[in-house]
Amino acid sequence: MKRICILKGSPRKDGNTNTLLKPFINRFESEGYICDTFDLHDMDIRPCMACRTCQQDQTVFGCCYDDDMDKIFDSIMSSDLIVLASPIYSWYCTPPMKMVLDRLVYGMNKYYGEGEEKPALWAGKKVAVLTTCGYRPEKGADLFEEGIKRYCKHSQLKFCGMLAERHLGYDTVFFDDEKAQRAVEFAEKLSCRLQHKELEI
């Protein structure tokens, strides 16, 4: 059974990013995928302190904190795709998403300890980004996309693409049929990628 881990960084349950996610998730579920979704704002997730406790055991996540990150770790390790879904705040993701990324880059990548072997526990996992922003995506979401591309390269992950949709302002309607269709098409392309079909995203 194919499984997807979806990390939701929006503080608003009915905000633009979560609205865009609905047809995206529905498309995957219609194909039989299991979608694990995590509302990061509702979870107990603490910031990385760079203590390197996680580097002492190269086989487990191993963080010193006893919080909800273990749930995310377990989901990621059993998933075929990781989806980072966040609105853009100051040209990057929201603070809870950034905390998760910081915790994962240490806990998953055993590059920083004393052991001779330095594995990436999640090497080969596929990553996609779904985001919303106020500027045109090429000016509003480009830094986040580039950051995640570098993050993936560092972590031996496979970046599979980004869907970014613009909102023109709080006095305008964000969601429409065209955005819904693009979300569905993005899900379809990612599904093809997961099935090892050659397809540009």
Model region roles, listed by residue range:
Residues M1-S86, S90-N109, E114, Y170-I201:
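N-terminal beta1-alpha1-beta2 submodule of the flavodoxin-like/Rossmannoid cofactor-binding fold
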Residues C35, F159-C160:
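Hydrophobic anchor at the start of a short beta-strand
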Residues G113-S155:
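Short, glycine-/small-residue-rich phosphate/pyrophosphate-handling segment
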Residues G161-R166:
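Beta-strand-loop-alpha "switch" segments that mediate conformational coupling across diverse proteins
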